[in-house]
Amino acid sequence: MAQQKPEWGNQMKNEGLDDMTLLSKVSNDQILDNLKKRFEKDIIYTNIGDVLISVNPFKFIDGMYSDEVLQEYIGKSRIELPPHVFAVAEQTYRSMINEKENQCVIISGESGAGKTEAAKKIMQYIADVSGERGSSSNQKVEHVKSIILETNPLLEAFGNAKTLRNNNSSRFGKYFEIQFNQKNEPEGGKITNYLLEKSRVVFQLKGERNFHIFYQFCRGATPQEQQEFGIYGPENFAYLTKGDTLDIDGVDDVEEFALTRNAMNVIGIPANEQKQIFKLLAAILWIGNIDFKEQAGDKVTIADTSVLDFVSQLLDVPSHFLKTALEFRQMETRHGNQRGTQYNVPLNKTQAIAGRDALAKAIYDRLFNWLVDRINKEMDNPQKGLMIGVLDIYGFEVFDRNGFEQFCINYVNEKLQQIFIEFTLKMEQEEYVREGIKWEPIPFFDNKIVCELIEGKNPPGIFSILDDVCRAVHSQAEGADQKLLQSIAVCKSNPHFDTRGNAFCVKHYAGDVVYEGPGMIEKNKDTLLKDHLEILQMSANNFLVGLFPDVIDTDSKKLPSTAGFKIKSQAAELVATLMKSTPHYIRTIKPNDLKKPNILEGGRVLHQVKYLGLLDNIKVRRAGFAYRATFDRFFQRYYLLSDKTCYAGNNIWKGDALSACRAILASQNVDNTQYQIGKTKIFIRYPEMLFSLEETRERYWHDMASRIKNAYRNYKAFQFECSNRIKNAFRNYKLYRQRCAQTIQGYFRAWKQASPFFDLRMQNEQLFQGRKERNRFSMISVRKYFGDYLDVRSQSYFLDAMAEGRNEDVIFSSKSQVMVHPILSANKLSPRFLIVTKQAIYLIKLKQKKNLATYLLDRRVPLAEVTSFSLSSLADNLLVIHTSTQFDVAVTTEFKTELVALINKQKGTTLAVNFGQSIQYFKKKGSNNTVTFLKDEMHKEIFLKKNQFHIASGLPASTTVAKVRKNPSQVSTPSKPIAKPVAKPMVAKPSGGSVIMKKPAPAAPPSGPPVMKKPAPTAPGGAPMMKKPAPAPGGAPMMKKPAPVPGGPAPGGSAIMKPAGGVSKPLPSPTGAPMMKKPAPTAPGGPAPAGAPTPMMKKPAGQPMMKPIAKPQPTPMKKPAAPPPQQYIALYEYDAMQPDELTFKENDVINLIKKVDADWWQGELVRTKQIGMLPSNYVQQI
């Protein structure tokens, strides 16, 4: 498989080998030569199988860690791209996902070799690729990712320092565990820290610095913090000037302090806790400035009490108690098990300085541990899942003077080397032997003997001897170091140990190191004086007290744990944790001790190559196997690759796992030399073979996905075709429904437009029913209340006459006549324009001035003053409107019923309506006037004579208007002639004792020639109107179709002739206003007596009504020939108002199909063959 180089790799010429297992000649010199070639070309990473070798370049290589490079390594195997720390991170993360096992990355090497930077890149990669980048729905995941990245600057500030070998040397060890959820997203974490070099707080070698945070704080603190905590430049504090080095080349402490503050904020440390941290840092610096001066009697006293006072203020402890704790040591005499007397023993200057430094070291050590615990608290995840650990621990150190700290650091590195040997050399070879694999053992150095020298119990190791001496000398300092050198001589039997005067030498895997004996016992005790502990626990600062929860037990004889015991226990726990995980190794190399770029010292690097055991590692890798797995695990991973073990992604194998493994390898044509079968595992020799299997496995799913996609595309194409057909059918169906809906909506709008007027009319009819004879014009059921028959809003002369009322909403208007009372003549009717608004009644008269018609306001009556109405009981048109404060209004109008209804509706109440043969009302000038009403059958016109109205008889007072059918959907509407009957239309039942108007019988002509009445004028909107009657077949006059004329009764004109018959079905006019069709002709015998039953009237109330004829069921039997249909001729034109009705013209011939009831018949129009309902009084039989 050809390697694909990322962009940064393609920009440089590849020198040397990416994988040193491919060296033609294996030797340390060849390894050095390969590393040197690559280093000179800025290629710092090289592989030995799965082990990454990293050489510290001491410079930034442009593009090596960019986001583009990081993305290229996602999902790639280690042989596909050049060696890189991202490749190790990718393999670690994918191994956790695929193998479902914990992983760890062990980074080893000496101080300054680049371990910390490698650890940061590992965590950066895992945080970047795990989950969905920057878009995770889980806020906890995003928070943990932020903490993973921000712990590095925070812990580096408090735990790293400049040393002679490294400008950013880790002075503590940490093992960072990243915990993942089921979605493989980081959801928790834990940091374990090891052996902080707290002695650096009070002492540094020449050329070294204290921990970074002190210099950052001194230079980056705000003016307020400087004032409050007494912070100045680092040159002002004794603890920061021990090494005579205050700066690091290329490092800005102010910028670094800003990063440290930001890390605290991201991790979640609140401002008040940050303030306490900085306060304790200032206290430590000022403790270092406390100096002592000797006095007589080997005593000391504090030289400058102002410094003591300021330290007391920072620690929130009483100044005199702190002074006593620093100048004296509390002692207690004992008598057996009984406590004796306590007294203070003065300290000499050396003891006082040691006590002062011990106090500063204890505060910093507890503060550092608190920071680690605070980070762990933010990342705590109670649900434990898979884990990836990253070990970044101090590297192997050798100085001119090496003490207890270097001894502990090198011990931990010795343990890590032992783990490396166990996994890469010893355990691998032992496994080959155990599995029966053909193998030639390769000798290697096992450093187990060195580890036993340091941590052994029998014979005792160096740590055990240190603890024994500490217990023996207890609180005595004199002679402790000499006692150690005497006791440690028992280790001379170990070939890796030797004594040299006041020191001893240990032959580590990385070389011989001489450790100085003096001071080791005191540092191993690692105890805080009881006096100092007591003074800290009495502090008023709860944060400081929380750092020292120790319980002081003066009666306990148990000695506290030593530093050696703690580091040995922590190392054992670390090894146990690492052994439970699958390890991945990064071996770092330091190219020079000058910490300068582009310099590789051959001898220095060769020494590291040797003690790291790279040569042995290459030999074992070349002779060994790249991959091994149990039969079952291999089968479960790769069963997809053989047709014998898999079908459509399902496991179909029925045999044992070993046979399945053979079948899988055979199906992939793997040669027998490329693998071996052990007792329980299968071993793959070359990594290329393993990656080929993985690529085939991935391609299987790709091929399956392609097949599924093709099938899905075919299904989608089929679905699309079906969808188009359904859409077309549905579109046609929607068009059909739309056309139907439009037709229905047209009828519904017409019905809806008329419905409120009909309802208002039907309600108002109850006021008149049985109390006043009715005009035939009023009985036309189709006529709706139009209201504004004069169209006042478009007539400016009306608006001008109304003056202030011109902006009022008009609800009624018509031409009318009012009763006027001339002084010297009889009362008479005078023409007026009657306009009713929502506020008042207006009477406007037309007056001629200088041959010009002028409209003037005659009278205005507010609606609020209208109290009641009076009408006669006869068929006249007089309406008297009574008012509360003005004289009454006596007006004649064809629309009296509508006028009463609209005024009642506007006032929101039903005013009293009085009926009688005479009406008394107040006329102008405050006097009363009485008009009477007389029946006069000799005159068809209504006329007024001497306050008497002469009126012919009208329709009986019990006559009612037929209600409009409001449910046309229940009546079938055939679209073409059919032979079967149609259901009976729904006709409203008459109310109370009233009757519904029927077709009248023909009336006899009068003795003289018929008197033609003036046509009824209509409003501009189209008011009801009548035409002159045409002669009936018998010679009697018949009503013609009325022609529209401008608005209500003409002023000064006579009353309108009423139609001879009423129609019980609504017929709309083209303009939306009601329009009368031709009425049926009157009978030759003339009008019937008033109140007498005639063919035009239904049965009186109380008698049963004829039920509607039910629709007969069709029968399959052949019917006999139907008799010839009865034919009728249309007397008037009729426009259908509802879907089931028939539209016809005058003189059209109609075949009668069925008489549904007396009012409505079903017929067939001969001209168009259409079938529908028709009013019976509009036709006459031929």
Swiss-Prot record:
Bias-annotated ranges (Low complexity): 1013-1042
GO CC annotation, single: actin cytoskeleton
SMART domains in alphabetical order: MYSc, SH3
Primary location group: other
Domain Myosin motor, first and last residues per copy: 15-698
Binding site for ATP: G109, E110, S111, G112, A113, G114, K115, T116
UniProt entry keywords in alphabetical sequence: Actin-binding, ATP-binding, Cell projection, Chemotaxis, Motor protein, Myosin, Nucleotide-binding, SH3 domain
Pfam families: Myosin_head (PF00063), Myosin_TH1 (PF06017), SH3_1 (PF00018)
Molecular function terms, GO-annotated: actin filament binding; ATP binding; microfilament motor activity; microtubule binding; myosin light chain binding; phospholipid binding
InterPro entries hit by this protein: Kinesin_motor_dom_sf, Myosin_head_motor_dom-like, Myosin_TH1, MYSc_Myo1, P-loop_NTPase, SH3-like_dom_sf, SH3_domain
Effect of inactivating the gene: Exhibits significant reduction in initial rate of phagocytosis. MyoB and myoC double mutant exhibits profound defects in growth, endocytosis and rearrangement of F-actin. myoB, myoC and myoD triple mutant exhibits reduction in the speed of whole cell translocation.
Location of this chain's protein in the cell: Cell projection, Lamellipodium
Keyword NAD among record annotations: no
Domain annotation SH3: ranges: 1123-1182
Protein name, entry field: Myosin IC heavy chain
